[in-house]
Amino acid sequence: MLKAKLAQLCESILQAAQLPDNLALFDARDEYLELFAVLSAMANFPGGGILLFGVSDAADGAPAQLCGVSDAARLTQIIDWQCAEMSPPIQPLYTQTTVDGKRVLAAQIPEIDKARKPCYHLAVGRPHGAFKRVGRMNRPMSEAEIHSYDAYNSRTRDELRPCEQARWADINPDGVETYMRRLESANRLRAGIDREQLLQMEGLMVDGKPTLASILLFSYDPQSFYPQYSIMAAVYEDGKARECRRLNGTLDTLCEQALQFIRRQLPAAVRYPMDAVREALLNALIHRDYSKYAEDLSVYLWISESHIEICSPGMCYGAPDMNTLPRGLRSLRNPKLMEILETLGALPQEHSGMQYMEDTMAAAGLPRPEIRLADDWCHVFFHLPPSDAWPETAVQDEAMAEIGRFLRRQDGAQLLFNLCRVLPAGKAQQVADAD
């Protein structure tokens, strides 16, 4: 960092009411500074962070105060010693300058490579020495967060682990046969392969036991083995829960039940682009954390007057920050689940997560969905306009799609054909394409 840039940073800090999350201030007059937590948090933070010494932190809403550094050489020795106690060791970049006659010292902490995360204090070990930056606080990482890094680095596939308490008789053979026929039609099966070997190759069986993927997609009752691998749905009015339900079933069934719950609870649901909500639900169910550390956690669906919120356990997998999400530039957690659902036709291959949701909402003239990551959870918000503020295109387009869905459920093939003949071409296509 250039000295002039550091001086500008100090001046902006002294005037700012709120400081960025990647900045930590220290009164260097303290005889001993324990920096292990903030060093770990900054090294794990996207883009790293800056430790600024000689500026006291704001208190009770008051601006930060310039206090200066008396012995910069001794301070750098203290910082270097603590950086060497981290794993992997941290190599800070120092910059000194004078502001209003007082010396300040900045230590830039680089973000470590994702393959080496999490950075932690060696003396206490990873379970207690790995920290993350939450706002301007340093918080210990949970076991699930640490496992997420390990799973990414070692390419651990939690969806392929065997379910020890289950038997293959607990799997619905009809669903598996449908999947096998789809594979055969795609020329992915070779003649002469043993049945059990084939199931193992496709990630459905390990040593005679069904895998988690088999349980989630083909079991008669997945929640009998993993009760919390469900959706907890609730409707709120004036901040109070009006209705709460637990939704059970396989992943595709969970998604459809959740969509029905939304349509039933929201008077305006027929006018909302439900394909975007379906994409968010599928992402939450497929790419949530299915590790042993998250077996007690469900996916949550909350509906209020102002928004629909879908909350799933697990942070971004393989994504350094939120900026890589919209274009789908991230690794995938549980890729076998996605592959099977795509093969079965339950997950359109052309959809690309966040970008698809944004495009769908924009086409309907509605606010883009919002994603927030907090405390190892991923929250997706769909903001609902007031009932008198819905764009006309959203009303018409979703109404046409809903008509198509209704006719398909009623097996009204002939009626659907006749309706499409009299509708304008664009509207007829929306009815015919509704899934």
Tell me what each language-model feature is.
Residues 89-168, 293-297, 348-351, 355, ...:
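Intrinsically disordered, low-complexity regulatory tails
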Residues 26-46, 194-201, 279-288, 360-364:
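Phosphate-interacting basic helix/loop segments used at nucleotide- and nucleic-acid interfaces
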Residues 216, 419-420, 428-433:
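A short acidic, leucine-rich amphipathic alpha-helix
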Residues 130-295, 300-308, 314-330, 344, ...:
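Active-site helix-to-loop segments that bind/position phosphate- or nucleotide-bearing substrates
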Residues 12, 257, 261-265, 284, ...:
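Generic, well-ordered alpha-helical scaffold segments in large soluble proteins
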Residues 398-426:
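Short amphipathic alpha-helical interface segments
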Residues 306-345, 388-406:
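Glycine-rich/acidic phosphate-handling loop/turn and adjacent ATP-lid/helix
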